[in-house]
Amino acid sequence: MVRAKRKLDHIEYALSTGQSRTHGFHDIDFVHQSLPNSNYDTITCETKIGELSLSSPIFINAMTGGGGEKTLHINEQLAYVAKHHNLAMAVGSQMAALKDESEAASYKIIRKVNPNGIFFANLGSEATIEQAERAVDMIEANALQIHLNVIQELTMPEGDRDFTGVLRRIEKIVLNSKVPVIVKEVGFGMSKETMQQLASIGVTAIDIGGQGGTNFAAVENERRQRMLSYFNNWGIQTATSIVEATSTNNNLSFIASGGIQTALDVAKAIALGANTTAFAGYFLRILMQDGIEKLVDEIDLLHTDLKFIMTALGAKTIEELQSVPLVVKGETYHWLTQRGIDTTHYSRR
């Protein structure tokens, strides 16, 4: 019951604390194209994460599950939206259902709603090979997310305090998983060094989960008597983390998440090097406050606006969008320069 209560607390506090919007995309400017040689009606948005083909560079990221009827209903509605727009979708951590079989229904509902959808299972880095297999089987998942959430755990009153052996555990899961493994952060971003470590053990897809969206340090601090306020602004901003990712020159697929709310955010993330983008808190807020039809409409508008932006840039495909010129400035440029990452290739391509 403690874990289920925590799931409901996370929804409540995630909605009340809001999105920080410190994702860094304001430091990214596209180079305007007066002769784009493009046609809105022929723009295509298909993309890939590793070997997984997606119809859209937008998917519904991990949010919830394991909190009884309320989380079942949320996942049911999100699965309907995913089916309507043919989007991939991830569930929240399934450890709750592995510990308590009665919670499995809140995850299994997505496959009932959308039998042919692309779904990602989700577990923390403490998971064993056997738990990973059970999580995948539970929802007949197409991929497995392993989330890294050190700062959330440290801020969580009942959270983990021992993070030894994590890389080795992930490696075992990667070597034994029957589906692709995506390693993701939960809002604190990833450094190039972390991504190089993950690539070295065979990980082929990473969700950088940058700072700028739902702040799980702030969420957990709401549940504490004594706040660890020094963690509230901890992390690497989303835009910065994407560039850190692409600077590794590894054969990795990258998912951009962390405060992404607009088609312009999506376009900038992809132009920086992401293969696709993921929405979580923003979609949850619309669903909970305005209803499912409003969320369906919002995703329609996101796709329309993304195609407008791609038309303006002369990018006919997502692959071409990854090659349009842009300028990195401000704090993002300063951070990357200090980290020894050259950004001039973005502006000169």
UniProtKB/Swiss-Prot annotation:
GO BP, sorted A to Z: isoprenoid biosynthetic process
Enzyme Commission number(s) from the entry: 5.3.3.2
Superkingdom of origin organism: Bacteria
Compartments where located: Cytoplasm
Residue sites binding substrate per the record: R6, K7, Q152
MF (Gene Ontology): FMN binding; isopentenyl-diphosphate delta-isomerase activity; magnesium ion binding; NADPH binding; oxidoreductase activity
Binding site for FMN: A62, M63, T64, S93, N122, K184, T214, G258, G259, A280, G281
This protein's record includes keyword Methyltransferase: no
Record keywords: Cytoplasm, Flavoprotein, FMN, Isomerase, Isoprene biosynthesis, Magnesium, Metal-binding, NADP
Keyword Transcription: no
Gene3D superfamilies named in the record: Aldolase class I
InterPro entries (alphabetical): Aldolase_TIM (IPR013785), FMN-dep_DH (IPR000262), IPdP_isomerase (IPR011179)
Pfam families: FMN_dh
Cofactors (names): FMN; NADPH; Mg(2+)
Catalytic activity: isopentenyl diphosphate = dimethylallyl diphosphate
Assembly description: Homooctamer. Dimer of tetramers.
PANTHER family linked to this entry: ISOPENTENYL-DIPHOSPHATE DELTA-ISOMERASE (PTHR43665:SF1)
NCBIfam families in alphabetical order: IPP_isom_2
HAMAP family (UniProt xref): Idi_2
Purpose of the protein: Involved in the biosynthesis of isoprenoids. Catalyzes the 1,3-allylic rearrangement of the homoallylic substrate isopentenyl (IPP) to its allylic isomer, dimethylallyl diphosphate (DMAPP).
Protein name listed in UniProt: Isopentenyl-diphosphate delta-isomerase
Species this protein is from: Bacillus cereus (strain ATCC 10987 / NRS 248)
Gene name linked to the record: fni
